[in-house]
């Protein structure tokens, strides 16, 4: 039985195998479609808990499954192999063994596609795999490479099938069946095969160039290396236009031949118009670049004259960047790690709570890198391995890193990259390092002591010198906690110290995580505490206000 189906080169057997693969892929694609529709059925996050990367992976998987593993295998591979030899009076296709290979590369492509969703955080690039979202900076793992391999394998299958159908139609017609007597279904398969033969090498070239950009440091689509991301769009949609025509031809193959010819003319018109539009855009851009150069030369003398608003804006941007760099250094000191792989590759990892994803997104927007969920824990990890991004980040935080362990790691990274190491600057009260370290290792909680609620803001660390600055500049107390192998804990509990910390420091240096929400609720906590609203015996409205506060605190 295995040999009967797996080794068969009979066109009808292979058609049945195509249908089986298409049905399986269609069911998987339908399941993904259902999840996508359920997620979009109402505003806000429904089932994926705000995991936008997972949603993007589902979109990619759904599109590739439906187009490359359902529509094309079923309409061309299935119906074509079963009906085309019958309609032209042939016993089989021209190349039966090529037919067998054309099918069996598809399951391998399906394995690559499924594997791509299970590696790293998945290929969340959109089904067109456009750079720069598909570049190594945005998706550093092998997930996108596996998705591209899946596209390569489907392209090989379609190319082999197209060659087979073209040769079969031209050379294996029965006596007396001339081309103008062919059924329209055979014509649609024949034209489709030609379109695939012309367009698939272009798609394969585009995704191969993308693979080279990702893995061999070329810059076909990398702007910083002189590449052009729009080139990929042109290459992909040279194939994409063909896919639309293929689907129309296959779905409406029973229409009159004149209508088929109109569709073909429309496709040719679309291709030509696309090419001419691209040429026109490039000519227009070239003309504009010349005009810009002339304008820049004219304005050179005026460049040094800055209006007061421009000067103010530049100073404000510099101040904001300085605050961000100080905050980032504090976050790295608390939850970060500088690593060196094989004595030559540097990397940075930062792990935060799942609800603080937006803080990592802000870092990613500035320096690149990737973000993925940590398995088994409610945490999310940011990872930066790109050398350009690492150099930019190290220059940003140089002089602000001060954690005992992190300083040693940071110094080694600076030596490897040839960057001068700057010793930590002296901390002042307006330095955002404190809030960055608080976002990483700090907590704000309240507990009941002798039936009275007590609010505590604290920061913990293994080394005394890393929390000593909090006491020196912001006040409070430090004590040694023997639990969890021992650590030092800085804390403030009195109302005056907590409110001073929020009003004098946090207002000027706001937290970039969800801790900021609880800090804002502190004033409400003290107002309700003065009213003794936490007592069940107190006024019912006050107790309801306390319950409402507790609910907001838990949700923050």
From Swiss-Prot:
Principal cellular location given in the protein's record: mitochondrion
EC numbers, comma separated: 3.1.-.-
Keyword Nuclease: yes
GO annotation (BP), single: mRNA processing
Sequence segments annotated as region (COX1 exons 1 to 4 encoded): 1-240
Location(s), subcellular: Mitochondrion
Region (COX1 intron 4 encoded): 241-556
Keyword Nuclease: yes
Record's GO cellular component terms: mitochondrion; respiratory chain complex IV
Keywords, comma-separated and alphabetical: Endonuclease, Hydrolase, Intron homing, Mitochondrion, mRNA processing, mRNA splicing, Nuclease
Pfam families, per the entry: COX1 (PF00115), LAGLIDADG_1 (PF00961)
Cofactor: Mg(2+); Mn(2+)
Resulting phenotype, residue 362 to K: Confers mRNA maturase activity
Gene3D superfamilies per record: Cytochrome c oxidase-like, subunit I domain, Homing endonucleases
GO molecular function, one term: endonuclease activity
EC class: hydrolase
Changes after translation: The mature protein may arise from proteolytic cleavage of an in-frame translation of COX1 exons 1 to 4 plus intron 4, containing the aI4 open reading frame. Cleavage would take place close to the Met-299 resulting in an active endonuclease of about 30 kDa.
Note: Residues 299 to 556 are sufficient for endonuclease and intron homing activity.
Subunit structure: Homodimer.
Family listed: In the C-terminal section; belongs to the LAGLIDADG endonuclease family. In the N-terminal section; belongs to the heme-copper respiratory oxidase family.
Function per UniProt: Mitochondrial DNA endonuclease involved in intron homing. It introduces a specific double-strand break at the junction of the two exons a4-a5 of the COX1 gene and thus mediates the insertion of an intron, containing its own coding sequence (group I intron), into an intronless gene. Recognizes with limited specificity and cleaves the sequence 5'-TTTGGTCACCCTGAAGTA-3'.
Protein name, per record: Intron-encoded DNA endonuclease aI4
Organism annotation: Saccharomyces cerevisiae (strain ATCC 204508 / S288c)
Gene label: AI4
């Amino acid at each position: 039985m295995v040999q009967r189906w797996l080794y068969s080169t009979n066109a009808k057997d292979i058609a049945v195998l195509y249908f089986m693969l298409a049905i399986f892929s269609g069911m998987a694609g339908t399941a993904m479609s259902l999840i996508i529709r359920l997620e979009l059925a109402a505003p806000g996050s429904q089932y994926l808990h705000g995991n936008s990367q997972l949603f993007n992976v589902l979109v990619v998987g759904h599109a590739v499954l439906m187009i490359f593993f359902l529509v094309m295998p079923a309409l061309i591979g299935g119906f074509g192999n079963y009906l085309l030899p019958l309609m032209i009076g042939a016993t089989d296709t021209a190349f039966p063994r090529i037919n067998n290979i054309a099918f069996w590369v598809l399951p391998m492509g399906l394995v690559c596609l499924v594997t791509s969703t299970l590696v790293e955080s998945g290929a969340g690039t959109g089904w067109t795999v456009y750079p720069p979202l598909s570049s190594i900076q945005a998706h550093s793992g092998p997930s996108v490479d596996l998705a591209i391999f899946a596209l390569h394998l489907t392209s090989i299958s379609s190319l082999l099938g197209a060659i087979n159908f073209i040769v079969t139609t031209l050379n294996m017609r029965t006596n007396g069946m001339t081309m103008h007597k062919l059924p329209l279904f055979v014509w649609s398969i024949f034209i489709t095969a030609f379109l695939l033969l012309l367009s698939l090498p272009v798609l394969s070239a585009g995704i191969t160039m993308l693979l080279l950009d990702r893995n061999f440091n070329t810059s076909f689509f990398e702007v910083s290396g002189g590449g052009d991301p729009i080139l990929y769009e042109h290459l992909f949609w040279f194939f994409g236009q063909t896919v639309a025509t293929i689907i129309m031809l296959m779905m409406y193959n029973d229409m009159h031949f004149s209508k088929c010819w109109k569709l073909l003319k429309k496709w040719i018109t679309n291709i030509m118009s696309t090419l001419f539009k691209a040429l026109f855009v490039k000519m227009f851009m070239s003309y504009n670049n010349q005009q810009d150069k002339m304008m820049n030369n004219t304005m050179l003398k005026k460049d040094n004259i800055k209006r007061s608003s421009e000067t103010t804006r530049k100073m404000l941007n510099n101040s904001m960047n300085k605050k961000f760099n100080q905050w980032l250094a504090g976050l790295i000191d608390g939850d970060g790690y500088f690593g060196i792989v094989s004595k030559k590759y540097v990397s940075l990892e930062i792990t935060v709570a799942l609800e603080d994803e937006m803080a990592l997104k802000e870092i990613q927007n500035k320096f690149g890198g990737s973000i993925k969920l940590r398995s088994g824990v409610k945490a999310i990890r940011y990872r930066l391995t790109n050398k350009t991004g690492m150099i930019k980040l190290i220059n940003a935080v140089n002089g602000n890193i001060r954690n005992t362990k992190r300083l040693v790691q940071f110094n080694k990274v600076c030596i490897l990259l040839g960057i001068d190491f700057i010793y930590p600057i002296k901390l002042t009260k307006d330095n955002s390092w404190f809030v960055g370290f608080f976002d990483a290792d700090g907590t704000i909680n309240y507990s009941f002591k002798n039936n009275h609620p007590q609010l505590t803001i604290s920061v913990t660390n293994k080394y005394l010198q890393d929390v000593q600055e909090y006491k020196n500049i912001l006040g409070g107390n430090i004590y040694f906690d023997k639990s969890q192998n021992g650590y030092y804990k800085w804390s403030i509990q009195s109302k005056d110290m907590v409110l001073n910390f929020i009003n004098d420091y946090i207002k000027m240096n706001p937290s970039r995580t969800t801790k900021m929400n609880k800090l804002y609720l502190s004033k409400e906590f003290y107002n309700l505490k003065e009213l003794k609203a936490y007592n069940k015996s107190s006024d019912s409205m006050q107790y309801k206000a306390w319950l409402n506060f507790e609910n907001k605190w838990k949700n923050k």
